[in-house]
Amino acid sequence: MNTVRVTFLLVFVLAVSLGQADKDENRMEMQEKTEQGKSYLDFAENLLLQKLEELEAKLPEEDSEESRNSRQKRCIGEGVPCDENDPRCCSGLVCLKPTLHGIWYKSYYCYKK
């Protein structure tokens, strides 16, 4: 009976001591993995930051090419009264004097060319 107790006690002590070693080893391994993960995340973050900076550097160049005044202003559609001195008819339309209808309102309307 004593041999069984001694054997059981010996196995128990070995299991506890080896379990502690495995626990410490697992903790160290987890620390290494998290450090590697952090370095990978830092690398990915730096790469993304570089890409965003490149895109941001290109944006002012595109903005300078097209200023606010270079956009097409609102235009007047077909059959709408226009000003003879300042025709704002859309492209493909011309500010002309009407032939029959509209002669009693304004003197010029936008018509197709």
From Swiss-Prot:
Subcellular location, record wording: Secreted
GO MF annotation list: sodium channel inhibitor activity; toxin activity
Keyword Nucleus annotated: no
Segment forming the signal sequence: 1-21
Family affiliation: Belongs to the neurotoxin 14 (magi-1) family. 01 (HNTX-16) subfamily.
One term under GO cellular component: extracellular region
Record remark on domains: The presence of a 'disulfide through disulfide knot' structurally defines this protein as a knottin.
Positions with biased composition (Basic and acidic residues): 58-69
Disulfide bonds: 75-90, 82-95, 89-110
Keywords assigned by UniProt, alphabetized: Disulfide bond, Ion channel impairing toxin, Knottin, Secreted, Signal, Toxin
Protein's name according to its UniProt entry: U11-theraphotoxin-Hhn1a
Keyword Mitochondrion: no
Tissue: Expressed by the venom gland.
Propeptide: 22-74
InterPro entries xref list: Toxin_22 (IPR012627)
Pfam families cross-referenced by the UniProt entry: Toxin_22 (PF08092)
Function: Probable ion channel inhibitor.
Disordered as annotated region, ranges: 58-82
Domain of life, per lineage: Eukaryota
